[in-house]
Amino acid sequence: MFIEVVKSKIHRVTVTEANLNYIGSITIDEDLLDAANLIANEKVSIVNNNNGERFETYIIKGERGSGVVCLNGAAARKAQPGDIIIVMSYAMMDFEEAKTFKPSVVFPDTATNKLI
């Protein structure tokens, strides 16, 4: 039996930009992606701590060290700069493997979006 578990999580990161006229996605600083074991084009779930919105999109790699977290396209309507969000991805795995699996979780500084 396979189950879906949290694979990666960026916990409490600040939205720096919202670009409604882009083709959809979330742009994230490459340092955060590496630390959380996330890659470009990976599907992610977003939770907005400020307004309770929950939605899915995919990742675009942002400039390393920039602290960028930009919601693009329709997702730009779900959060605004300054909002605190959580970014999560999931993986399917065997039930027994899932019992011992440890997700990659990072807790960036919400003022700078840099790793602490």
Swiss-Prot record:
Its cofactor is pyruvate. GO terms for biological process: alanine biosynthetic process; pantothenate biosynthetic process. Substrate binds at T57, G73, A74, A75. GO terms for cellular component: cytosol. The keyword Cytoplasm applies. It holds the Pfam family Asp_decarbox. Keywords: Autocatalytic cleavage, Cytoplasm, Decarboxylase, Lyase, Pantothenate biosynthesis, Pyruvate, Schiff base, Zymogen. The modification Pyruvic acid (Ser) is found at S25. It is found in: Cytoplasm. Binds 1 pyruvoyl group covalently per subunit. Pathway: Cofactor biosynthesis; (R)-pantothenate biosynthesis; beta-alanine from L-aspartate: step 1/1. Heterooctamer of four alpha and four beta subunits. Catalyzes the pyruvoyl-dependent decarboxylation of aspartate to produce beta-alanine. This is Aspartate 1-decarboxylase. The gene is panD.
